[in-house]
């Protein structure tokens, strides 16, 4: 027993664990899981963390109840602000321009440089009216040419009788099929009157002529805008509607879409309008082109 109690000095520390244990270092046990004693432990326990989280949650709930029970008075132009809601402002900030104009704000209309509603005060004059009529019977053109006055017929040059009258001053083309074309009248009434006179001449020559399907096929008008026009600038700006070849023809050809009218525009300011079926199309086309011509007026 004395030999067991007497241990060498180097083994005395191992025999007494309490004297060999360093403060702050845990005691290792063979049954302890590997790495348990090596993991540093936090200085604060989990009980203290849960207490702090519970206090923060209680403070947030108290603040939410206070904000919902006492809503703040919203200023003018703003909606009441609730907890975790975004403020919606309808009034613009000072010194900024609102994105959408107010419906009560008066809006200034944009005036075009050459308004289409501007009246020119110029009325185009009708220069020629082309009309057609059907006499309703076959005609012997040689007989008409020999027996009628002021009639000529040359079948090698043109297969129709050319007849003229003085009042109204017009010319008729009479075909063997009974169709007739009347040109040269200055108004719709004159064109109809002239066509009836030609039909009466044919009747007197012994043909059963009638007066069927009278129709105006074309009207030609002209006017003067009283100022020179820059045709080069006009054709560049309106090149999809116009063509200008001064070496071939001195006028600019402008093909209007609505109404379907063709205009011949000259540098002197003279304008010729053709292709109309009624008189109103001539007037409408000129009122449409006049602001454009005014925009290309020569200054010198």
Curated annotation (Swiss-Prot):
Compartment(s) of residence: Nucleus
Biased composition (Low complexity): 57-99, 107-117
Similarity section: Belongs to the TBP family.
Protein name: TATA-box-binding protein
Keyword list, A-Z: DNA-binding, Nucleus, Repeat, Transcription
Organism: Protobothrops flavoviridis (Habu)
Top-level taxonomic group: Eukaryota
GO molecular function: DNA binding; RNA polymerase III general transcription initiation factor activity
One Gene Ontology CC term in the entry: nucleus
Primary localisation category: nucleus
Gene3D superfamilies linked to this entry: TATA-Binding Protein
Assembly with partners or alone: Belongs to the TFIID complex together with the TBP-associated factors (TAFs). Binds DNA as monomer.
Function in brief: General transcription factor that functions at the core of the DNA-binding multiprotein factor TFIID. Binding of TFIID to the TATA box is the initial transcriptional step of the pre-initiation complex (PIC), playing a role in the activation of eukaryotic genes transcribed by RNA polymerase II.
Presence of the UniProt keyword Nucleus in the record: yes
Placement of Sequence repeats on the sequence: 126-202, 216-293
Chain intervals for the UniProt region annotation (Disordered): 1-22, 53-119
GO biological process: DNA-templated transcription initiation; transcription by RNA polymerase II; transcription by RNA polymerase III
């Amino acid at each position: 027993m004395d030999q067991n109690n007497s241990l060498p000095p180097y083994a005395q520390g191992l025999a007494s664990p309490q004297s060999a244990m360093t403060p702050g270092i845990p005691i290792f046990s063979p049954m302890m899981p590997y790495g348990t004693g090596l993991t540093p432990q936090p200085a604060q326990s989990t009980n203290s963390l849960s207490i702090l989280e519970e206090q923060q949650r209680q403070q947030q709930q108290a603040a939410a109840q206070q904000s919902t029970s006492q809503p703040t008075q919203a200023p003018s132009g703003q909606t009441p602000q609730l907890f975790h809601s975004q403020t919606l402002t309808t009034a613009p900030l000072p010194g900024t321009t609102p994105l959408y104009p107010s419906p009560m704000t008066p809006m200034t209309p944009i005036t075009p440089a050459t308004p289409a509603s501007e009246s020119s005060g110029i009325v185009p004059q009708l220069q020629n009216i082309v009309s057609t009529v059907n006499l309703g019977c076959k005609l012997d053109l040689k007989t008409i040419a020999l027996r009628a006055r002021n009639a000529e017929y040359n079948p090698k040059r043109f297969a129709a009788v050319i007849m003229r009258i003085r009042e109204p001053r017009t010319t008729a083309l009479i075909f063997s099929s009974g169709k007739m074309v009347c040109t040269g009248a200055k108004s719709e009434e004159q064109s109809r009157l002239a066509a009836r006179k030609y039909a009466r001449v044919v009747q007197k020559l012994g043909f059963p002529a009638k007066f069927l399907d009278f129709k105006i096929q074309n009207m030609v008008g002209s006017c003067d805008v009283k100022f020179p026009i820059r045709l080069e600038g006009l054709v560049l700006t309106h090149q999809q509607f116009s063509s200008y070849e001064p070496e071939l023809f001195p006028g600019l050809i402008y093909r209007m879409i609505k109404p379907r009218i063709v205009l011949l525009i000259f540098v002197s300011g003279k304008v010729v309008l053709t292709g109309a079926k009624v008189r109103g199309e001539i007037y409408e086309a000129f009122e449409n082109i006049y602001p454009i011509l005014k925009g290309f007026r020569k200054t010198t």
